[in-house]
Amino acid sequence: MNLKRIVAVAAASAVAFGAVVSISTPSLAATNVCKATDLKTAGGMDALVKAAKKEGELNVITLPRDWANYGEAMDLFSKAFGIKINDDNPDGSSAYEIQTIKTAPAAKQPDVVDIGVSALNGVIGAGQDKLFANYKVANFNAIPSKWKADNGNWYGDYNGIIGISYDASVSPAPTKIADLTNPAYKGQIALTGDPTAGQEPFMSVYAASLANGGSVDNIQPGLDFFKKIKASGNFTSVKATGENYVAGAYKIALTWNFNAPGNIASAKAAGKNLKFVIPTDAVLAGTPYIQAINAKAPHCAAARLWEEFLYSENKGKTSAQLTAKDIKLTGSKLFNTIMGGQNVFVSGGAAPILQADMIKKNSIIDGPEGFNVPKGAKVYQPSPDQQVTGKALVAAQWPTL
């Protein structure tokens, strides 16, 4: 089903306000931040920062520190605003995030989610529970219309390319997905999770399909590929996490390029030498991950401030550069002093959703080298409709491969 069509049924469109963060917008006399649908109705940036600081906490979910540079994002946000961040199940899946919103007690509810686009199927649309709150960040107008709900119910944040991470001891070093059938890799290959639940492993199956004669319309060759390497003993069911890698439980994984810089740094700190390559036989770009505010968010102001931060294009200071003097600034001045989340993603190797706008404004920083698409390579990206079809096949076949 078409993502925009789902949203059109789910909610009426609203007119977005300007994208510039106001420094001096007055606080509203009786502001209910939990009902705020944009920065203006939240009382302006100074009022939002004050309210978020008063709450003092932010509940996030399934955010590994080395995922898209989220470790820096959380450190910077927490240091700047004095807000404690609680991260539930960092190595969980998009499915876990949705299930937690539906079933967790009030105190354990996440304030915000970061989920794969395929997780929206069955979550938004006619007859579905209203899991998310409508909120338009200041830069809402600059988000491509394809990747946002007209009413601000959800919006894309960043995306990446599927690549191969591997221990430097692996020989021969893999350069394409088809290489992973090599008997030399017996017991060494893993995915970052269950493709029926997580977006990254799901996209890894798509990449395997492209490398084996499939297409974004046909994920079956990818399933056949994993069935083959499972039967040969190359594929292991252990989850590809940093802890399992350091323990030697696997040596090769399919992963997003935006996780590679953080993974390599973490591996080095543990005395391991991790490498990364974009496969030459399949260059697959994921659709953007999706941000949304939980309609039952226990920290309404912190949730909205977090989203404003993630969609800021500021080039500003990192957590290491932020000073005690900076932290004493008023809310809006402090907000405009720190590096915006879109550039934090860039520094981790991700492609930010506001990239086109940032290039136009010259507000984008340089990302790390060596993790980008090879020059001249053809990039494939499955649409939301194609992912719905692909997910159904994976759900039906993966458990019995």
Model-derived segments and spans:
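Short, polar/charged alpha-helical segment
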Residues: 42-53, 63-84
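Short beta-strand->loop
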Residues: 132-141, 152-155, 181, 266, ...
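A bilobed periplasmic-binding-protein/Venus flytrap-type ligand-binding module shared by bacterial periplasmic
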Residues: 163-170, 205-212, 286-299, 318-321, ...
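C-terminal capping/gating helix-and-loop segments adjacent to ligand/active sites or protein-protein/ligand interfaces
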Residues: 317-401
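Periplasmic-binding protein-like
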Residues: 145, 159-161, 223-228, 234, ...
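A ligand-binding cleft/hinge motif common to bilobed small-molecule-binding domains
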Residues: 119-124, 252-272
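Extracytoplasmic ligand-binding site segments that recognize negatively charged/polar headgroups
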Residues: 59-75, 86-102, 108-249
